[in-house]
């Protein structure tokens, strides 16, 4: 999976298209990511001992990894490639050529 936790990404599809934010969680088994402030859903919680009223909680839902592009340090969005530098496999931005890791 080309996106990692902590990466700054731009959403390229969906209702939050154009938003730039940080990846909070990567879910490689389902190829999805949770991005800060993107795809907000409302979750209804039942009343419990600690919260007798119940609540409606807003949280981020996972979006497909193909709907985001990783930004490099200069803010250039591009596809991610892999190459070997000094015997280590690193990710790089194919558009700018800048190493991401």
From Swiss-Prot:
Which range is the signal sequence, renumbered to this chain? none
Tell me if Glycosyltransferase is a UniProt keyword of this record: no
Q: Report the record's Gene Ontology biological process terms.
A: translation
Q: Keywords of this protein's UniProt record, alphabetized? A: Ribonucleoprotein, Ribosomal protein, RNA-binding, rRNA-binding
Q: By its UniProt entry, which SUPFAM superfamilies does this protein fall under?
A: Translation proteins SH3-like domain (SSF50104)
Q: Which GO terms describe its cellular component?
A: ribonucleoprotein complex; ribosome
Task: List the InterPro entries.
Answer: KOW, Rib_uL2_dom2, Ribosomal_uL24, Ribosomal_uL24_CS, Ribosomal_uL24_KOW, Translation_prot_SH3-like_sf
Record has RNA-binding as a keyword: yes
PROSITE patterns to which the protein is assigned, alphabetical: RIBOSOMAL_L24
| GO MF, one annotated term | rRNA binding
> Which function does this protein serve?
One of two assembly initiator proteins, it binds directly to the 5'-end of the 23S rRNA, where it nucleates assembly of the 50S subunit.
Protein name (record): Large ribosomal subunit protein uL24
Query: Source species, please?
Result: Streptococcus thermophilus (strain ATCC BAA-491 / LMD-9)
| Classification of source organism | Bacteria, Bacillati, Bacillota, Bacilli, Lactobacillales
Gene name, Swiss-Prot/TrEMBL: rplX
